[in-house]
Amino acid sequence: MRTRYDTHPLVDQARALGPIVEQGRDEMDQQRHLTSPVVAAMQDLGAFRMAVPAQLDGPALDPMTQVAVVEELSRLDGSVGWCAMIAAAGSYVSGFLAPDAARRWFGPADVCLAGQLAPTGRAVRVDGGYRISGRFRFGSGSGHATALIASCLVVDDRHDGAPVRDERGRPEIRSALLRPDQVTMIDTWHTTGLWGTGSNDYEAHDILIADEDSWNPAGAMRRTEPLYRYPPLFLVPHAGVPLGIARAAIDALIEVADSKASAALGGRAKEGRALADEAQCQEAVAIAEVKLGAARAYTYDTVAELWELLEADERVPPKQRAMYRAMMTYGHQVAKEICVSLADIGSTSSIFHGEPLQRSLRDILTACQHRMVHPKLYVPAGRILLGRDSGDPMV
């Protein structure tokens, strides 16, 4: 089912990557990173720089289109969609940096960021910048990234490395961009799913970072266009991942149901009777379609409502903030329900490596562990709805 938001030409171009992705799927699983042809195709598509502003020759796609592109790529392969999501989210960093630094990092057409914002490093203030050290986790897309994010607690070496506090008494956090040659990659990505993302750890040791190559991730962006008025909008590409994975699972079961004997449901096989003829299979597919349709509608409507506020330069009210974050979690949980239920129906089609149902199941189980979409995020959303402070700066 298509929406008015997934008719952008880039969505069709993403769909056309299917043969390239299929050809490289086994290699991506084995090598645990995207293949060079897939990376090149995604660069040509602009999938890694969806939020780069037009002034830097970027596409500056509206958030609904970002979701739609990631959804389609995730339908083709969860790892491909995940890498697009991470890089697209990273491209919002262009809104934090001063113009010259933004052009230096985000002007090249092959720009691709990896990493995340958890402050696991240490930054010491020096003249003109910071000295950064630390180990950083989950560098999704690190195998083809042109820059990696290093987020750090700012510490004071003069006081035994005590955290520096901001004017509100909170620990000061500084994020910075590092070149791949400034870090050491650590082979840690041996996981349940999303094998091809190459989400390895990386380390930096006493790297000097200029002020202009760093930013306060809790602060406001420098750019003032609608796409950069609400910093948590950088999460929006994430919403497309579960929708695409769930779509792939439904399509996979439908494809196998005509050729798979009904004994898969535990009964005795009947002559000439396929899985598609069993009521349990029919019910499961119908429920999955309804659940996915509802989750998609809620996702796109929530993002569109938020976008209307930003385009009108209006403040995002608390309820809208709560629903935006809850939407992220909801989409992932619904997709997990779909993939688990269809894996049960698919039986042995869900346990062998290379089977589409198995791939969807392991990918969504892994995706749902991300801290930005975990069910615990319902709590701060609920706090807002009940008139309390969220207790979470990202909500």
Which ranges hold each PLM region?
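Well-ordered mid-protein domain cores that form the structural environment of catalytic cofactors
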Residues: S91-G128
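Glycine-rich beta->alpha junctions and the first turn(s) of the following alpha-helix
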Residues: T192-L292
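Glycine-rich phosphate/cofactor-binding loops in nucleotide/flavin-utilizing enzymes
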Residues: T348-V395
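N-terminal glycine-rich anion-binding loops that anchor highly charged ligand groups
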Residues: H33-R49
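Generic structural signal for well-ordered, non-transmembrane alpha-helical segments
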Residues: G244-R247, A286-G293, R325, T329-K336, ...
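DPxDG-like acidic metal-binding loop motif
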Residues: R135-V183, G198
